[in-house]
Amino acid sequence: MNNTEYYERLGVDKNASQDEIKKAYRKMSKKYHPDLNKEEGAEDKYKEVQEAYETLSDEQKRAAYDQYGEAGANGGFGGGGFGGASGFSGFGGASGGFGGFEDIFSSFFGGGGAQVNPNAPRQGDDLQYRINLKFEEAIFGVEKQVKYNREELCHTCDGSGAKAGTHPETCHKCGGRGQINVVRDTPLGRMQTQTTCDVCHGTGKEIKEKCTTCHGSGHEKVAHTVKVTVPAGVETGQKMRLQGQGDAGVNGGPYGDLYVVFQVEASDKFERDGAEIYYKMPMDFVQAALGDEVEVPTVHGNVKLKIPAGTQTGANFRLKGKGAPKLRGSGNGDQYVIINIVTPKNMNQAQKEALQAFAKASGIEVSGSGKKGFFDKFK
């Protein structure tokens, strides 16, 4: 049974004070934080440090660990409110055959289940920020400076919550245990139980003179700027996670994350569906009838496209690789050119005569008067 491993993870001995443990935790947490240490295995080390601190920062868990090792810290031995009931896993524990008794005792004694350690490090809250992107920025990617407000450790008290020149003191009511004894009258007689201290709320520390900047919270709102590298090919609604850019943690816990949500502006020229881009190209009916080589705009620049004779409205042509980059994959999508044949509205006399000659050669009778017919009155 190894009951020194947690101390070794933090680099302290078994007689270390809580201040020494907390200081060592901050040092080791920073050393192995995934954002700061990219070496293989650093993230696992970081998790081990978190696990060790969660136990050693809690005096009850620490005592159980010192006596029984990791099994004791996890509730495998002793620690229950009545003779170490949590150790009797053979009876199904709290959810086994005696689950009803726990409910009864809980109603009498104000607890019975496992309590959250208020001194354990907790990760800060996650935040969300929306970035507006131009159509081309979403296609090719871009770097953006994002400025937002987040909770950071108070610069005046360094997160302690105490006024400058002072520090949190041991709670006068619970003596630093975070728990107080309460005597209650129950149907089983007068019983003494433990509950969370109502002065320090389980922290064991009492702030008598609060910091004038954060008013005892240990945090303050600060304008924060971060550079966001937007990958090529993003679309509206997609998110990007920036680890550690959220609110500050509690009790030395890590910062939360920032989730950036993208909003892409529509283009007045193109339409997009994933990696595919669509362009509706107006075309003169003469070009469509005789065929032509035309210049087509794409997000990558203009390209030449051969239009075969007899092309009809709605015909589409694929420009391979001229679409948006594939966000999950390699290469680009395609661009589709959709033909929309335009009929001229105002023609000069020569153009009219040419069309009339074409109609005659085609055996088509056209009045060419331009006057409205009978049914046109009802349109």
UniProtKB/Swiss-Prot annotation:
Cofactor note: Binds 2 Zn(2+) ions per monomer.
Residues binding Zn(2+) 2: C171, C174, C197, C200
Disulfide bonds: none
Every J domain range: 5-69
Domain of life: Bacteria
Subcellular localization: Cytoplasm
Zinc finger (CR-type): 141-223
Residues that hold Zn(2+) 1 according to the record: C154, C157, C211, C214
GO CC aspect terms: cytoplasm
Cofactor(s) listed: Zn(2+)
Function comment: Participates actively in the response to hyperosmotic and heat shock by preventing the aggregation of stress-denatured proteins and by disaggregating proteins, also in an autonomous, DnaK-independent fashion. Unfolded proteins bind initially to DnaJ; upon interaction with the DnaJ-bound protein, DnaK hydrolyzes its bound ATP, resulting in the formation of a stable complex. GrpE releases ADP from DnaK; ATP binding to DnaK triggers the release of the substrate protein, thus completing the reaction cycle.
HAMAP family reported for this sequence: DnaJ (MF_01152)
Domains as described in the record: The J domain is necessary and sufficient to stimulate DnaK ATPase activity. Zinc center 1 plays an important role in the autonomous, DnaK-independent chaperone activity of DnaJ. Zinc center 2 is essential for interaction with DnaK and for DnaJ activity.
Name recorded for this polypeptide: Chaperone protein DnaJ
